[in-house]
Amino acid sequence: PCFLCAKNRPAEQMHRVVESRYELLVNPFPILPVHFTLPTLKHQPQRILPMIGDMLRLAQRNSDLTLLYNGPHCGASAPDHAHLQAVSSGILPLQRSWQRLNHNLTEVAKTDDEEGIWQMADYPAAALVIRSHSVEHGERLFKSIYRALPPAEDQTEPMMNVIAWSNGDELLTVVMPRKKHRPDCYTAQGDAQFMISPGAVDMGGLIITPREEDFRKLTPDVVTAIYREVSLTPE
């Protein structure tokens, strides 16, 4: 049974309907001080296109939260039930480094002086950032990226993680195209094994290690190698 469907959740689980089609749930296994899961009221597959507008609206209305999307084979814990996540804003290293990253962006497409799509040249994973001043413009720019990405084998959408937050009067949406679910080190043997299956939080620079031994032996070089292995090549 699907653990995000209301009929299968514990009676103690508090919930609130938001945007008329999601339930706001406190994540029972949080990885950040504030961590919500927002499943759709209806059981339906994890797909970004029907949710991107809602994701941007939630980010715009809740500047203290960062919205996350994990594709079906990109860290999603429930790929058969559509959901977003929301966490405390400003905690991910991606966000904390934004002022620096912002100074080395490669233009991909612009709609005016301030809105458009840029490639993040200084980030270790393949990443595109959408800068927009409205949900509608952000959604339109996202769809142009979506259409340009290669479809994944046996899946109905390109592999990706998406991170969105409000930055003053603009919306920032970081799209991280993927080519692989997990790095080879996930199934490696002995000291070569790292049980890291990256989702949006990990791709945003905060690596979650279920095992203490992985935490202790993790290095920047290993993290960079994982990013490069699972990311679509920047080209």
Feature map (PLM): residue ranges:
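Active-site beta-strand/loop microenvironment that shapes enzyme catalytic pockets
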Residues: R61-R96
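Active-site microenvironments that recognize anionic phosphate/pyrophosphate groups
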Residues: P1-D54, S77, S89-E235
